[in-house]
């Protein structure tokens, strides 16, 4: 199944997974970009954003749990985030944290907050519509993800 065919299925978990990948890239880039400032609150939220990018990486690409040496506690925590509702909750929490970064003043972390919130909405819509989680083949789903989880 090509990427175009995956998007044509109208399964919101596929949209959520790809928005999650975009969120990961944004969180990584913006976390690094905003860490070089003199505002302590912004530095704290930048570090949280940077950590979120690595958590998202393990959530969206489950093959990495097999490849990377991580603790069993971390593996168990990531494996619990397997349903659409759990993913929506995880992304919503990360999004709310980034929205809270605006308390210290406007910054580019708002882009991460927007994408994390959009990802949470996609996963929540997939859950509400009763769509089963379908992993993108491009990201290691359909067979590879099932073997690991």
From Swiss-Prot:
InterPro entries the UniProt entry points to: TVP18/Ca-channel_flower
GO biological process: vesicle-mediated transport
Annotated membrane topology: Multi-pass membrane protein
Transmembrane residue ranges: 18-38, 41-61, 86-106, 108-128
Disulfide cross-links: none
Glycosylation sites noted in the Swiss-Prot or TrEMBL record: 11
Keyword presence, Transcription regulation: no
GO cellular component: Golgi apparatus; Golgi membrane; membrane
Main location per the UniProt record: Golgi
Pfam family of the protein (one): Cg6151-P
KW Phosphoprotein (keyword) present: no
SMART domains: Cg6151-P
Keywords: Glycoprotein, Golgi apparatus, Membrane, Transmembrane, Transmembrane helix
Localization per record: Golgi apparatus membrane
PANTHER family (UniProt xref): CALCIUM CHANNEL FLOWER HOMOLOG
Family per record: Belongs to the TVP18 family.
Function of the protein: Golgi membrane protein involved in vesicular trafficking.
The protein's name in its UniProt record: Golgi apparatus membrane protein TVP18
């Amino acid at each position: 199944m090509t990427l175009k065919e995956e998007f044509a299925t109208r399964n919101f978990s596929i949209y959520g997974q790809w928005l999650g990948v975009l969120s990961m890239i944004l969180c990584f880039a913006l976390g690094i970009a905003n860490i070089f400032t003199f505002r302590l609150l912004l530095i704290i939220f930048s570090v949280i954003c940077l950590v979120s990018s690595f958590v998202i990486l393990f959530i969206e690409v489950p093959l990495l749990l097999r490849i990377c040496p991580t603790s069993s506690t971390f593996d168990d925590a990531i494996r619990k985030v397997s349903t659409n509702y759990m993913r929506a909750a995880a992304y919503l929490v990360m999004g709310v944290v980034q929205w809270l970064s605006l308390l210290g003043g406007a910054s580019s972390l708002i882009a991460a907050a927007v994408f994390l919130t959009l990802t949470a909405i996609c996963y929540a819509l997939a859950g509400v519509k009763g769509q089963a989680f379908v992993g993108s083949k491009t990201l290691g789903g359909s067979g590879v993800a099932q073997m690991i989880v």
